[in-house]
Amino acid sequence: MTKVLCKKYNEELDAIPFQPLPGELGKKIHSEISNKAWQAWLAHQTILINEYRLNLIEPKAKEFLKEEMQKFLFENKEDKPEQFNEI
């Protein structure tokens, strides 16, 4: 499997096997983010969608998730909702 120097974990890990999003952002994620980090983002994204009850049809919700994704993957910021408690 192809390796990538992951920006989130700052180590060489398995790359995402496909470009996860279209466009320049998708290319950047594919070349700089590991599959491990992408899977962690998908889990975090699920928390955000559920806790904030996001409607993904709304452009505002999509933009919010895009901003959170960039913070999570490239700035290593993982903001969870105030009321969220892990089980």
From Swiss-Prot:
Swiss-Prot/TrEMBL keywords: Iron
Ribonucleoprotein keyword on record: no
A GO cellular-component term linked to this record: cytosol
GO biological process, one term: cellular response to oxidative stress
Keyword Iron found: yes
An annotated Gene Ontology molecular function: iron ion binding
Pfam families reported in the protein's UniProt record: Iron_traffic
InterPro entries assigned: Fe_traffick_prot_YggX, Fe_traffick_prot_YggX_sf
SUPFAM superfamilies associated with the record: YggX-like
Organism domain of life: Bacteria
Function according to Swiss-Prot or TrEMBL: Could be a mediator in iron transactions between iron acquisition and iron-requiring processes, such as synthesis and/or repair of Fe-S clusters in biosynthetic enzymes.
Family per similarity comment: Belongs to the Fe(2+)-trafficking protein family.
The protein's name in its UniProt record: Probable Fe(2+)-trafficking protein
Phylogenetic lineage: Bacteria, Pseudomonadati, Pseudomonadota, Gammaproteobacteria, Thiotrichales
